[in-house]
Regions:
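Histidine-acidic metal/acid-base catalytic patches
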Residues: 1-27, 96-97, 159-181, 185-266
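N-terminal pre-domain/capping segments
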Residues: 1-97, 122-123, 129, 178, ...
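Active-site-proximal loop/turn and secondary-structure-junction residues that shape catalytic pockets
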Residues: 10-12, 35-37, 64-67, 103-107, ...
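Conserved beta-strand positions in the central sheet of alpha/beta enzyme cores
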Residues: 32, 60-62, 100, 147, ...
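Glycine/Thr-rich phosphate-binding loops of Rossmann-like dinucleotide-binding domains
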Residues: 41, 109, 156, 217, ...
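Catalytic-core regions built around general acid/base machinery
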Residues: 44-55, 131-135, 139, 196, ...
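Structured helix-beta-strand junction loops
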Residues: 54-55, 142, 175, 203
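Active-site acidic/histidine proton-transfer and metal-coordination neighborhood
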Residues: 70, 74-178
Length: 266
């Protein structure tokens, strides 16, 4: 059975300890952290260390910033790399597994005007390889993993499918860089999400879950049995981290996720 986590902002409670108490009661195995910019995640280290001492399980962190390592602007790109390095170091310090980030988010979409980005595909690739290599080397030194998340075509123009992420990771050639898959984005971009998991299984390091409409698993029409079944066949042993919006009563919605996923084959 796969382990299930909830991102911290979804859980009721003021402290990580209170959130963890609720999470355990609902059937979760862990909390996925969120990391804002301006080195905010590093400033939380005393809080995180105390939570760890109190038994809170926090294996992964997901970036929560407005710019990313694939940014068009050199200064923003450099800052994103500095932030991600810090986040990787912090998650390593609390005994975690890794940090998840997309190449970019909301910066450009080929599906919306003006349709052609200001940077060539060749330069995009160079930028992504440079960033992934630098971050991957830092992750390796810290003993953790960088998870590259493909986003759908309306949110990013560079890495939309598992195939694209896998190609970049192969070229980087570091075991410390892996794909962080997301069921919502895969539902939009992959013609066969389950087959995509099987095809790229060696490169998958982390999984985030939400349904076809971005709400909690069970609120949409994603084929969970096929998706989860593919992860089992692929030998995936990581976490399923709920990164979603909530429909209905938010407390009951987040409470419903573990039972739904387990009932669907997790």
């Amino acid at each position: 059975m796969l382990k299930i986590a909830a991102q911290e902002q979804l859980l009721p409670g003021e402290s990580l300890q209170h959130k963890w108490e609720f999470a355990q009661g609902a059937g979760y195995d862990a909390i996925e952290l969120r990391a804002k910019g301006d080195l905010h995640f590093a400033s939380r280290l005393p809080e995180l260390k105390q939570a760890l001492k109190d038994g809170v399980v926090m294996p992964t962190v997901c970036v929560d910033m407005l710019h990313f390592f694939g940014a068009f602007d050199d200064g923003l790109r450099r800052d994103a790399i500095v932030q991600m390095k810090s986040q990787l170091s912090v998650i390593a310090e609390i005994g975690g597994l890794g940090a998840q980030t997309p190449a970019s988010y909301g910066m450009f979409s080929r599906r919306l005007p003006p349709f052609e980005p200001p940077r060539s595909e060749e330069r995009d690739r160079e930028i992504l390889l440079e960033g992934l290599t630098e971050l991957g080397e830092h992750a390796s030194a810290e003993g953790v993993t960088l998870y590259l998340e493909p986003l759908n075509r309306y949110e990013d123009h560079m890495v939309n499918r598992l195939e694209q992420a896998a190609e970049l990771i192969k070229e980087v050639g570091l075991d410390s860089v892996r794909i962080g898959i997301d069921s919502y984005h895969m539902n939009i971009e992959e013609s066969d999400p389950a087959q995509a998991i099987l095809t790229h299984a060696p490169y998958i390091g982390h999984a985030q879950v939400s349904d076809s409409n971005r709400f909690q698993p069970g609120a949409g029409h994603l084929d969970w049995q096929a998706w989860l079944g593919a992860l089992h066949i692929a030998g995936y042993e990581g976490y399923l981290a709920a990164e979603c919006r909530l429909t209905g009563d938010p407390v009951e919605a987040v409470r419903s996720v573990p039972a739904f996923l387990k009932g669907s084959g997790a």
